[in-house]
């Protein structure tokens, strides 16, 4: 879900922080991409409905491959346009998110039942709709995605927890320029730049500038975090009676969730009819706030980003022999990678493009000590 209707709020209250650009504008930039979010998108867009069944891209054993098709195409598109993608995968979800995960699982179970009913009645469009609400990323699918990206030669990072938080940490440490995800909570994790709508090189990219956003909203980072929690986030249920515009008004006036909740309590006491605000019984905003301000991430200073030449032969074995891809298609995509160009009039030599990036010595946040990435050591985190 991310942050409920945050984009709509920014369009109204902080339009100057949003701009659109062509993909070529970011040539030469390193970007951290939320792999988990992208995989769900790719699975959804590669499903279709026939008169009698739901059709998915699969290998010879019936395993879905739509996420691999999408990751390959997206990665090649970015490299071909001069960008340097880093793919970041989710680790374990925070324990505090268990309630939201349970809610999502219930929704998936309901979608599965509705899909079954739709198939029985022959309504394949409804069945497809419910199929897309019941998508799962298995461990095997994740492992295949990582293998694909490593064979293509791009860096892969296994985050200890939330991928968006790790992407934001990399961007704050200037290891990359921006976070690429559709989830608006990357801003709550304070990514300097958020890029959305990298779905096609034909569509403009939406860029959100974090510092300009705070300036236009006239909020500090902590106040913005409280605003996001009040709007509705993945960690907590929403307060009945509060929409994004009202949430912004309350935070602007009262500056913190503590003061907002005190105000709500007073308003409810004075109400002679139905209470205006209904706060969930387990509204642990303090823990939610801490997850945003002090997320569990790998220390960016321990991460070395390295772009390598693709292992074309191994990639063909994996995609063509195991996953049923067209050899011609794989060859064509790898030729695009090997012929990658900068898009500002100059051509980049292959050895320049796939070189080890120098270690960045810029400041970074504290993070988790738990080792989850083969190319980095994690450090457990204190306050940022």
From Swiss-Prot:
Cofactors, names only: Mg(2+)
Annotated positions binding DNA: 74, 162, 232, 234
GO cellular component, one term: mitochondrion
Record-linked CDD domains: H3TH_FEN1-Euk, PIN_FEN1
Cofactor note: Binds 2 magnesium ions per subunit. They probably participate in the reaction catalyzed by the enzyme. May bind an additional third magnesium ion after substrate binding.
EC number: 3.1.-.-
GO terms of molecular function: 5'-3' exonuclease activity; 5'-flap endonuclease activity; DNA binding; magnesium ion binding
Ranges where the record places region I-domain: 126-254
One GO biological process term: DNA replication, removal of RNA primer
Binding, Mg(2+) 1: 34, 90, 162, 164
Segments for region (Disordered): 340-384
UniProt modification remark: Phosphorylated. Phosphorylation upon DNA damage induces relocalization to the nuclear plasma.
Record localization: Nucleus, Nucleolus; Nucleus, Nucleoplasm; Mitochondrion
The protein's assembly and partners: Interacts with PCNA. Three molecules of FEN1 bind to one PCNA trimer with each molecule binding to one PCNA monomer. PCNA stimulates the nuclease activity without altering cleavage specificity.
Protein name: Flap endonuclease 1
Natural source organism: Tetrahymena thermophila (strain SB210)
